[in-house]
């Protein structure tokens, strides 16, 4: 007895004629508007911000605290380097945030707005497993203690006999 690995199909499919011309038209037109080419329509742009206090209020994150360090002068702020900001006593995360906004403001890349700080979930990516494990262990322990207290209460009332 022999088995055929490749059986012929029961119904032969008709062969279609090859197309004589190939029409290659895109389904939808390609957009040429990149993010960098779009115009900035916001009111908080380079043309509308003339003082440092307004700038700091728009970018948020309590940068207004450092207004005195720059003597409320926008041009002085825009020319300040990271090293100078460090010498002024501005912490690293705020300093980097300000420097990013200086770059975006000078090149008119983005309207001024506050970027919220990220919030860690479950202690951050590295510690997530241990934090979740501790949390579930504490839940189990609380459940166990609650069950034991209920059992003791039931035994005291005489509902359980051991």
Swiss-Prot record:
Coiled coil: none annotated. Residues 1-37 form a transit peptide. It comes from the Eukaryota. It is found in: Mitochondrion. Keywords: Mitochondrion, Ribonucleoprotein, Ribosomal protein, Transit peptide. Residues 112-135 are annotated as: Disordered. Belongs to the mitochondrion-specific ribosomal protein mS41 family. Involved in telomere length regulation. This is Small ribosomal subunit protein mS41. The gene is FYV4.
């Amino acid at each position: 007895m022999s088995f055929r690995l490749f059986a012929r199909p029961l119904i032969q499919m008709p062969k279609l004629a090859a197309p004589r011309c190939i029409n290659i038209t895109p389904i939808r037109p390609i957009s040429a508007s990149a993010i960098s080419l779009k115009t900035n329509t916001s009111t908080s742009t380079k043309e509308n911000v003339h003082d440092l206090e307004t700038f700091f209020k728009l970018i948020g994150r309590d940068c207004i605290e450092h207004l005195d360090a720059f003597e409320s002068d926008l041009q002085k702020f825009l020319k300040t380097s990271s090293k100078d900001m460090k010498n002024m006593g501005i912490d690293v995360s705020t300093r980097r945030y300000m420097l990013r906004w200086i770059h975006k403001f000078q090149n008119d890349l983005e309207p001024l707005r506050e970027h919220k700080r990220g919030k860690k979930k479950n202690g951050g990516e590295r510690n997530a497993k241990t934090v979740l494990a501790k949390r579930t262990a504490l839940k189990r322990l609380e459940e166990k203690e609650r069950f034991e207290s209920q059992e003791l209460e039931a035994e005291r009332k005489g509902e359980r006999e051991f």
